Amino acid sequence: MPAILTRHLPILLGLTCISLTSTAWSATCNKPNVKGYQYVGYLKDGLAEVAKDTPQGLKTGFVNAQGKLVIPTIYESMNTVDDSPEKLVPAFAEGVAAVNKNMPTGTKYGYIDKTGKTVIDFNYEYAGNFSNGLAPVRQNEKLMYINHAGKTVFTVPYDDAASFSEGLAVVAKQGKFGYINTKGKLVIPIQFNLDEGDSIDSYRFSHGKAKLFKNGKPFCINTSGKTVACP
């Protein structure tokens, strides 16, 4: 299977099957052999997301490696990027997945475990994957990171914030981005231009490097923010 380009499939970065380039750092991705769905995602922690048309519209749930539906297709589509099915994939991470569904106050995000049980209530306008015990969420237009108990660990004064990868998370403000550590401290300054249409998740670290772009040309940085050779 070809490597998945992080630049074009940012939501997949919660999975293990990622690649910094089209040939380097790739890993095997597996999908369950199941039919009857408009989309079948890659297995992560033994589960894969599926999307199915219902009278209420496209809904998502999860199947196991044998293709058995273990979490019903009751959640809203995770299509936060565009209409291509490959962008519908929220990964289970640290035993939970961020999903969204219609609530009386509108569409809200929460977290479920691998049995489908709600473990963090649907209170958020946005919710990202857990990593390093933290997940980025937006509530009442404020960005923050929460723990597995749903408690706020720290807030961040940025326009957007991503999940952690190798101890760092991308944060963006006014079209530029940098990186914070797990204490919320900005350790790589807000200085890089955010390409139009790209998710900030596409700039996360893998194997000690992050692939960025300047004037359409790629370059890489290490976790200290220094420019290094790309693989």
Q: Across the structure, where does each feature detected by a protein language model lie?
A:
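Bacterial N-terminal signal peptides that target proteins for export
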Residues: 1-11
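Bacterial N-terminal signal peptides
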Residues: 10-19
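Residue-level detector of conserved, function-critical positions
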Residues: 25-231
